[in-house]
């Protein structure tokens, strides 16, 4: 049941690819941010954190396509009120076949090559692909809106 929440976002991402919503050309590696929002089971936060910070990063970064990961905790200060999920894992994926990467994750969860924990309470997951390059405040200092747009587009 907990795995179902994790898999929901992968199905949405796969559908986006089928409908042609991902940028790029066939056979060209694309970059994705796979974001998993979750909580720890009540009374199991220590186990949850140990699993996520060690075992889960260990397992998923061994899957072809997964290139990096970063784990976050909800800040005490929020722009628009507190959120129900206290944790966010951002997985960076680079692949020309996202559905196959997610199929590999599902297969590994099913056969035990990727260890899961009963301390995980899924909220939701989503996968995003970039529209612009990453832009810093330093890059745009003194630039016009048009210049910033060109920087964001990588021109």
Residue ranges and their predicted role:
Residues 1-11:
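Bacterial N-terminal signal peptides that target proteins for export
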Residues 23-155:
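Macromolecular interaction modules
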């Amino acid at each position: 049941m907990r795995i179902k929440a994790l898999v929901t976002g992968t199905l949405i991402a796969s559908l986006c690819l089928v409908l042609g919503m991902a940028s790029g050309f066939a056979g060209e590696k694309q970059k994705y941010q796979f974001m998993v929002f979750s909580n720890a089971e009540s009374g199991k936060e220590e186990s949850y954190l140990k699993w996520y910070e060690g075992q889960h990063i260990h397992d998923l970064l061994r899957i072809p396509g997964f290139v990096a990961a970063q784990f976050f905790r909800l800040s005490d200060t929020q722009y628009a009120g507190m959120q129900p999920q206290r944790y966010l894992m951002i997985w960076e994926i680079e692949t020309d076949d996202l559905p196959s990467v997610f199929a590999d994750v599902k297969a590994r969860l099913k056969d035990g090559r990727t260890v899961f924990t009963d301390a995980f309470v899924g909220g939701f997951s989503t996968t995003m692909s970039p529209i612009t390059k990453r832009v810093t405040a330093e890059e745009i200092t003194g630039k016009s809106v048009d210049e910033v747009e060109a920087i964001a587009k990588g021109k």
